[in-house]
């Protein structure tokens, strides 16, 4: 499988060069209120996606109003000063557009996909739902029940639960440690005043990016932005996009064992401090993650895999159900590590943790081959191309990059960064990030045999 992947994308630079010659790249402009417009024109298409990215998510909340950004997302389509809920739905259907939104720890995003001639209408609607929502009390109460049910569903998703707890202990008493939905007590108590205060504080022009991709004319989108978003106020003390807005997050050593002995599996997340979106070693972190890789028993690969960890997992079929290496980045911090699902017995849990630590130590010791490094780089480039499939995916990439780093690297620029990575870079990165550094860990399920953080640190540092 890996050789086929490497072969398939051996000529990615030639392919990317062809694509780049046809696409003019990302253009940016800025309104007087600080709002950034960023676009990428895609030839030979008649549709486009436009999205408004706000540099504010659950990270912009406090303990008392945690969950407000997500609550606002639910209310965005429930009526504005200019349109009723039915009116919004009818208008979207009449132009055949698709409207959606999501909230993350750092961003609030609303986007619409439409035909080229309907871009002005799409921008108008995005502005309306973002800046002029009515926030009707009856709608608030209805959505409160919906969000409570959503929270209950999330609690059944073990990976979500584990990673929420991982953030909470790793960023203890810090904004990044808060969940996106917020605690149930907040969901039950958030008021219209809380919602309006969040908008007033965070919805500022200099904290917004209007991104467009597809059959979109940059100059025209700038005009639409001025018409529909020009009224958005500017921050009293604007901070450039990609610059810190507060104290840098502190990575905290810690562990949490959530005992659920009735579960047939144990879920474990082990993390060390990773890298931010704009860190110089961002792509090295991803390449190191790719070398560690992922494995799933259900897929049945591994015995012929070039990954020693995958081979160990597959040769002992009960060692783990699956594992997934991760490199999660934020504007000024990150988490790098492994998520494991295994049967709840002492033998399996101890073995899989030891095998993972063995793999990390192998990378630190330099016992990786040039072939592994080249394979990891090929996988990164392949993943990039596959992730930019369609105007919506490109808008997501543009918006995320500009909001978090202040600029957008083109795919070709990313390829250049990845191609520069050497085996020595990865070894140096692993020795800096994985040696004598604090570890955080969360385990869910039958946790009685899960090694603690002290054990992991001791083994990793040997």
Curated annotation (Swiss-Prot):
GO molecular function: metal ion binding; metalloendopeptidase activity
Classification via Gene3D superfamilies: Metalloenzyme, LuxS/M16 peptidase-like (3.30.830.10)
InterPro entries: Metalloenz_LuxS/M16 (IPR011249), MPP/UQCRC_Complex (IPR050361), Pept_M16_N (IPR011765), Pept_M16_Zn_BS (IPR001431), Peptidase_M16_C (IPR007863)
Phenotype upon changing residue 70 to R: Loss of zinc binding. Loss of catalytic activity
Enzyme class, spelled out: hydrolase
Catalyzed chemical reaction(s): Release of N-terminal transit peptides from precursor proteins imported into the mitochondrion, typically with Arg in position P2
Active site positions, chain numbering: 73 (proton acceptor)
Co-factor note (free text): Binds 1 zinc ion per subunit.
Phenotype seen when the gene is deleted: Simultaneous disruption of the mitochondrial presequence protease CYM1 results in synthetic lethality in respiratory conditions.
GO annotation, biological process: protein processing involved in protein targeting to mitochondrion
Subcellular location: Mitochondrion matrix
PANTHER family in UniProt: GH01077P, METALLOPROTEASE
Designated name of the protein: Mitochondrial-processing peptidase subunit beta
């Amino acid at each position: 499988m890996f050789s086929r992947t490497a072969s398939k994308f051996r000529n990615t630079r030639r392919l990317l060069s062809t694509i780049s010659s046809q696409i003019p790249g990302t253009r940016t402009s800025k309104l007087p209120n600080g709002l950034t417009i960023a676009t990428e024109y895609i030839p030979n298409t008649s549709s486009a996606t436009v999205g408004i990215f706000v540099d504010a998510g659950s990270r912009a909340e406090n303990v008392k109003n945690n969950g407000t950004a997500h609550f606002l997302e639910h209310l965005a389509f429930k009526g504005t000063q200019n349109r009723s809920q039915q009116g919004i739905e009818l208008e979207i259907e009449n132009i055949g557009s698709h409207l959606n939104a999501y909230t993350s720890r750092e961003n609030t995003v609303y986007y619409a996909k439409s035909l080229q001639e309907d871009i002005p209408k799409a921008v108008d609607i995005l502005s309306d739902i973002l800046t002029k929502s009515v926030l009707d009390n009856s709608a608030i109460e209805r959505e409160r029940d919906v969000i409570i049910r959503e929270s209950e569903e999330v609690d059944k998703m073990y990976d979500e639960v584990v990673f929420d707890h991982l953030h909470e202990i790793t960023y203890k008493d810090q904004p990044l440690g808060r969940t996106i939905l917020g605690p149930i007590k907040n969901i039950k108590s958030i008021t219209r005043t809380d919602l309006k205060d969040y908008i007033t504080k965070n919805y500022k022009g200099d904290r917004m990016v209007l991104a467009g991709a597809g059959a979109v004319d940059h100059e025209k989108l700038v005009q639409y932005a001025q018409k529909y978003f020009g009224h958005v106020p500017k921050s009293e003390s604007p901070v450039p996009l990609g610059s810190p807005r507060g104290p840098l997050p502190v990575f905290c050593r810690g562990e949490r064992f959530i005992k659920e002995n009735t579960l047939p599996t144990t879920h474990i997340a082990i993390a060390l401090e990773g890298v931010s979106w704009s860190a110089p070693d961002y792509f090295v972190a991803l390449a190191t993650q790719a070398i560690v890789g992922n494995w799933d028993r259900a897929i049945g690969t591994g015995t012929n895999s070039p990954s020693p960890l995958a081979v160990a997992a597959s040769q002992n079929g009960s060692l783990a159900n699956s594992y997934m290496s991760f490199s999660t980045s934020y504007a000024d911090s990150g988490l790098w590590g492994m998520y494991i699902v295994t049967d709840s017995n002492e033998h399996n849990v101890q073995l899989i943790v030891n095998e993972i630590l063995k793999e990390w130590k192998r990378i630190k010791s330099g016992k990786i081959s040039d072939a592994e490094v080249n394979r990891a780089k090929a996988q990164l480039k392949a993943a990039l191309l596959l992730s930019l499939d369609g105007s919506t995916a490109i808008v997501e990439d543009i918006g995320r990059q500009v909001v978090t780093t202040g600029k957008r690297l083109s795919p070709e620029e990313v390829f250049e960064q990845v191609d520069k990575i050497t085996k020595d870079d990865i070894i140096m990165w692993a020795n800096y990030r994985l040696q004598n550094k604090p570890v955080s860990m969360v385990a869910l399920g039958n946790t009685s045999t899960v090694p603690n953080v002290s054990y992991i640190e001791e083994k990793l540092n040997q």
